[in-house]
Amino acid sequence: MAESFEKKRPVLAVVGPTATGKTALGVALAEQFGGEIISADSMQIYKGLDIGTAKVTPEETHGIPHHAVDLLEPDQTFSVADFTALAGTLETDLSARGKLPILVGGTGLYVQSFLYGVRFTAEKAPDGLREQLAAELAEKGPAALYEELKQVDPEAAAAIHPNNQVRVL
């Protein structure tokens, strides 16, 4: 289900809601520290969704490369597992070229899974499992479900706070 890893290279992150100045700050940091941007926005990966996502314009980039933008058609799927794999590849490449990876975006699950070491696989849960676990959560409470997670996947449990019911589920 999840695999954890240890970050060994520096990565900056600029996170927050849409249209709050993340792009401008990310570009300024990239200019100052020799970095490139990795978009952590679940919608900017798609071509043609420029307005609703406040997608960076060519002028706003100031020539700083922006990765993970306009890669897919809107009818293609892209999961957190896909993002962490792509961001990991980009981080390795940028670091090898002496560039500072700067994660910029507002998709919290993308940011958390990448920065805090939980890598999700693309495996689909068996039919009905999520509903079964949600019922168990309602019946037994979050502590019991977290204890079950510790038994099934100790690495994932170590990377997830016991009170984060969404991630525990």
Feature names for model-found ranges:
Residues M1-L169:
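Phosphate/pyrophosphate-binding catalytic cores of soluble transferases and nucleic-acid-acting enzymes
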